[in-house]
Regions:
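NAD(P)-dependent Rossmann-like dehydrogenase/reductase catalytic/cofactor-binding core
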Residues: 2, 182-249
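Short amphipathic alpha-helix with an adjacent loop that forms part of the alpha/beta core around
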Residues: 44-49, 71
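Short, charged/polar "capping" segments at the starts of alpha-helices
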Residues: 33-38, 87-91, 131-135, 242
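Rossmann-like NAD(P)(H) cofactor-binding subdomain of soluble oxidoreductases
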Residues: 52-56, 60-113
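NAD(P)+-binding Rossmann beta1-loop-alpha1 motif at the extreme N-terminus of oxidoreductases
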Residues: 1-46
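Internal alpha-helical scaffold of NAD(P)-dependent oxidoreductase catalytic cores
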Residues: 94-103, 115-201, 225-229, 238
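Alpha-helix C-terminal capping/helix-to-coil transition sites in glycosyltransferase folds
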Residues: 49-50, 120
Length: 249
C-alpha cells in the first residue's frame, strides 16, 4: 500500500514518520521543500506517485484545494482528512470532487508533548459512507491507532471543534479568575492551587492569552453554527480583555 501525507508541518511530519515506521511505503508532499530522513518528499504535485491513501494534514483553509488535487490524481483512493474543518466540509468536498471514499480522523497531536500526546492516541473517526468507514478503520488499525467510531462524519467534525472550544472556555475562565484575583490583590496561583485540590476541579494556567491558531479558530467555527452563543461570546471577549490586561500588568 502506498500512502502520501500532504502538508509537512507540525502535524504532518510526525504523521509521515510514524507511518514510515509502521512499514508502509510513504511519500510526503509540501509546497515548501522539507527534507525528511529516508522518506521521499515532493514539492511538485505532478511528481507525487499515485497512492492508495492520502492523509491530509494541511491548514484548514487549504483542505479543499488539496482534495481537488487528490481527485485529479486518483479519485478512487482513500482520503483521510486529519485537518480541523468546519462542520459539513468533508461531505461537501466528497460531493464536489467526486471522492467516494473519505474519512475524517482529526489529529490530537500536541507539539509540546509528543511522547504522551503524539500520533498514536485514541482518536475519533467518521466517514461519508460504510465503505469509507471500513477502509478507514482498516488503515488506522493497521497503524495501531485506537479509534472511537462516530455515527457520521459530521459528528467527527463537530467533536474536534467542540474539544478545542471547550478548552478555550476553560482557559478564558482561568483568565477571568486571574483578573479578579489581581483586582483584589490575591495570588491567582495560590487560589488555583487550592481549587485544584478538589477531585473534580482542574483550573488551567492563565498565561499570555489564548494564542496560536487552533483554539481561537475552532471556537469561531463552533460559534458560527449558532444564532446565539453567549458562553462562547463571553469567553472570546474575556480573552481579548485579558490580553489587554496582561500587557498593562
Amino acid at each position: 500500500m502506498k500512502v502520501c501525507v500532504i502538508g509537512l508541518g507540525n502535524i504532518g511530519i510526525p504523521v509521515l514518520e510514524y507511518i514510515s515506521q509502521r512499514g508502509f511505503q510513504v511519500y510526503g508532499y509540501n509546497v515548501v521543500e522539507k527534507s525528511i530522513k529516508a522518506i521521499e518528499t515532493f514539492t511538485g504535485w505532478e511528481d507525487v506517485p499515485k497512492c492508495d491513501v492520502y492523509v491530509v494534514a494541511v491548514s484548514s483553509n487549504s483542505v479543499e484545494d488539496v482534495c481537488k488535487k487528490i481527485s485529479n490524481k486518483n479519485k478512487n483512493s482513500l482520503v483521510c482528512i486529519e485537518s480541523t474543518v468546519p462542520v459539513g466540509t468533508c461531505r461537501k468536498i466528497s460531493e464536489t470532487f467526486d471522492l467516494s471514499t473519505l474519512v475524517h480522523c482529526p489529529h490530537r497531536f500536541w507539539v509540546e508533548d509528543p511522547i504522551n500526546h503524539g500520533v498514536r492516541q485514541l482518536r475519533v473517526i467518521g466517514a461519508i459512507n460504510e465503505e469509507s468507514l471500513r477502509l478507514g478503520l482498516d488503515f488506522y488499525r493497521s497503524l495501531d491507532i485506537p479509534l472511537h467510531v462516530c455515527g457520521s462524519i459530521e459528528i467527527a467534525e463537530m467533536c474536534k471543534i467542540a474539544e478545542n472550544a471547550y478548552r478555550f472556555v476553560q482557559i478564558a475562565f482561568a483568565e477571568e479568575l486571574r483578573m479578579i484575583c489581581g483586582s483584589r490583590k490575591i495570588s491567582f496561583d495560590d487560589v488555583r492551587e487550592a481549587c485544584n485540590t478538589k477531585w473534580n476541579t482542574e483550573i488551567p494556567e492563565a498565561r499570555e492569552g489564548i494564542l496560536g491558531a487552533c483554539l481561537p479558530k475552532d471556537t469561531r467555527y463552533l460559534r458560527l453554527l449558532a444564532d446565539s452563543a453567549p458562553l462562547l461570546d463571553g469567553a472570546i471577549l474575556t480573552d481579548k480583555n485579558y490580553q489587554k490586561w496582561i500587557k498593562r500588568s
